[in-house]
Amino acid sequence: MAEKEKWGIANIYSSFNNTIITITDITGAETITQWSGGKVVRADRQESSPFAAMEAATRAADDAKEKGIVGLHIKVRAPGGNGPRTPGPGAQAAIRALARAGMRIGKIEDVTPIPHDGTGRPGGKRGRRV
């Protein structure tokens, strides 16, 4: 019988300041590799750029391939909560780079935390007065 293919989960956290890519096994319990935009570029202002996300995703995919992972289910997360609910500029670039690196892509889902009327937004009763 043929050996079963190993799949993993790619957690992509993309804010407007950075992009963090963590690849875990299928249970999500064991981290295989973790890369961020800040690890691959030198300037702080470029951490969130699509180029940094692409570079981080490529390196993460290489690490995962070494461990024998052939496919990934992708979970995209934005800051959420009181922060923005849209992923940063690196999310799409990271997904594309993972696919281009030769990883098979399974499900892509959005796991941004959404408050069910939790705490109030920063700014107070009268908002931010400029």
UniProtKB/Swiss-Prot annotation:
InterPro entries: Ribosomal_uS11 (IPR001971), Ribosomal_uS11_archaeal (IPR019961), Ribosomal_uS11_CS (IPR018102), Ribosomal_uS11_sf (IPR036967). It comes from the Archaea. GO terms for biological process: translation. GO terms for cellular component: ribonucleoprotein complex; ribosome. GO terms for molecular function: rRNA binding; structural constituent of ribosome. Residues 108-130 are annotated as: Disordered. It holds the Pfam family Ribosomal_S11. Keywords: Ribonucleoprotein, Ribosomal protein, RNA-binding, rRNA-binding. Coiled coil: none annotated. Belongs to the universal ribosomal protein uS11 family. Located on the platform of the 30S subunit. Part of the 30S ribosomal subunit. This is Small ribosomal subunit protein uS11. It comes from Methanothermobacter thermautotrophicus (strain ATCC 29096 / DSM 1053 / JCM 10044 / NBRC 100330 / Delta H).
